[in-house]
UniProtKB/Swiss-Prot annotation:
Residues 1-21 form the signal peptide. This is T cell receptor alpha variable 17. Glycans are attached at residues 38, 42. Residues 22-112 form the Ig-like domain. Disulfide bonds join 43-109. The gene is TRAV17. Alpha-beta TR is a heterodimer composed of an alpha and beta chain; disulfide-linked. The alpha-beta TR is associated with the transmembrane signaling CD3 coreceptor proteins to form the TR-CD3 (TcR or TCR). The assembly of alpha-beta TR heterodimers with CD3 occurs in the endoplasmic reticulum where a single alpha-beta TR heterodimer associates with one CD3D-CD3E heterodimer, one CD3G-CD3E heterodimer and one CD247 homodimer forming a stable octameric structure. CD3D-CD3E and CD3G-CD3E heterodimers preferentially associate with TR alpha and TR beta chains, respectively. Keywords: Adaptive immunity, Cell membrane, Disulfide bond, Glycoprotein, Immunity, Immunoglobulin domain, Membrane, Receptor, Signal, T cell receptor. It holds the Pfam family V-set. PROSITE patterns: IG_LIKE. It comes from Homo sapiens (Human). SMART domains: IGv (SM00406). GO terms for cellular component: T cell receptor complex. Gene3D superfamilies: Immunoglobulins. V region of the variable domain of T cell receptor (TR) alpha chain that participates in the antigen recognition. Alpha-beta T cell receptors are antigen specific receptors which are essential to the immune response and are present on the cell surface of T lymphocytes. Recognize peptide-major histocompatibility (MH) (pMH) complexes that are displayed by antigen presenting cells (APC), a prerequisite for efficient T cell adaptive immunity against pathogens.
Amino acid sequence: METLLGVSLVILWLQLARVNSQQGEEDPQALSIQEGENATMNCSYKTSINNLQWYRQNSGRGLVHLILIRSNEREKHSGRLRVTLDTSKKSSSLLITASRAADTASYFCATD
């Protein structure tokens, strides 16, 4: 009898939420990685902000808040998540360490 061994694949989708009519850029639009690898997603914004928040959304479900970083913070951690904020470049990154199949979702950033 043959045993079939497969590699689990985690697909993370990043989309940028446009808040207050800001035009943003997303990078990457789709990310495909192996389970256990780290995933980094980026978002950029055009105007000054007070806070930046990251959300995730599973297919057919509502948004789930992940983490908030204030404009005076550079880095913040929560479990396997790490978010960085560079206000001089108007950009933020979300790092998910040791990705799992359950991390498959659309990811959004929003500013206020």
